[in-house]
Amino acid sequence: MIERYFLVMKFTKMHGIGNDYVYVNCFKEQVTNPSEVAKKVSDRHFGIGSDGLILIKPSDVADFEMDMYNADGSQGAMCGNGIRCVAKYVYDYGLTDKTQIRVATKSGIKVLDLKVKDGKVQEVCVDMGAPILKPDEIPVDVQAAEAAGEERLVNWPIQVNGAPYHMTCVSMGN
């Protein structure tokens, strides 16, 4: 059986340091079932190809709201590269003329500072908040840390192919 799925919507594909998403301006477009849409558009063989789908929406608590869906359709809380592209999108497409904006995400409201040159955003700085270092909140297998009585895996010694390394497990919210 051949699966047929037709979707007509305007979108923009953007990337921040290679982390690419399909962006939809939900001030103009409606996206029903964003989890399924994310899976379809993210497919690099039969879709547009991306790390996921980001919806740019109106917000009652901030200047904008960002809803992010991963390529597997799961909803993410936050993506630093993705939110920087949201800032560029809303400024460059005329949704705001502010050079500091607030964007509501599933991990809270983020404040972004936009550096503008010749009417276009050249750089975006975002306060991502405090990093998560507790292994069970990242998540990461915590057996070794628990056995050693550690609450965090910071500068933890490991061996990879016989070579010694130190690792720190950290999450910024997705």
Go through the PLM ranges and name each one.
Residues I2-K120, Q159:
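A glycine-rich beta-to-alpha transition motif near the start of alpha/beta enzyme domains, typified by
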Residues L95, T105-N174:
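ATP-dependent small-molecule kinase catalytic core of the GHMP/sugar-kinase superfamily
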